Amino acid sequence: MERAYSPSEILKKKIPSIPFEGVWRDAFGEPGRTGVWLIWGESANGKSSFAMQLARELTKHGKVAYNSLEESLSLSFQNNMRRCRMEEARGRFLVLDREPIEALTERLKRQRSPDFVIIDSLQYTGMNYKEYKKLKEQFPNKLFVFVSHADGEKPKGSTAVSVQYDADMKILVQGY
């Protein structure tokens, strides 16, 4: 049988967080450093732009990997990086060009692997919910940020809908 905790034990526990400042703190407070976030929105509403700005902010708190499954290393991706001045985050930001989940898993097993992993997009991973859970549970000390397509105001597809229920932070992007 697993150990049970008292309320006082839980409240005394130091849970690592991201000490956002300014507009990021106003929007998200001080979220946990681990777990899952889901960003979703309709096409051309700014999901990737928002994700890149989030990546830039996260580089202040650790190492970030951005797996560009959907856009790859396209001109729009390059322009997005330029707008967010990602070159200033040298050493704390790396771009993965359509890295399969199996290769990403191997990368995350290494020492000094990224603290934060942005996957753009969930649909392009081809993962089902069981595979998503396996990835998340294999790396409990990482924060995964998945970008998802939308069907109206809901994430698109059964995996994305299930991830939405599981995610610690849920961000709908509209007209960003």
Q: What are the roles of these predicted feature ranges?
A:
Residues 15-31:
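Pre-Walker A adenine-sensing motif
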Residues 34, 61-62, 114, 141, ...:
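Short, well-ordered alpha-helix to beta-strand connector turns
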Residues 41-42, 69, 119-123, 149:
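Structural motif
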Residues 137-176:
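Phosphate-binding/switch region of NTP-binding enzymes
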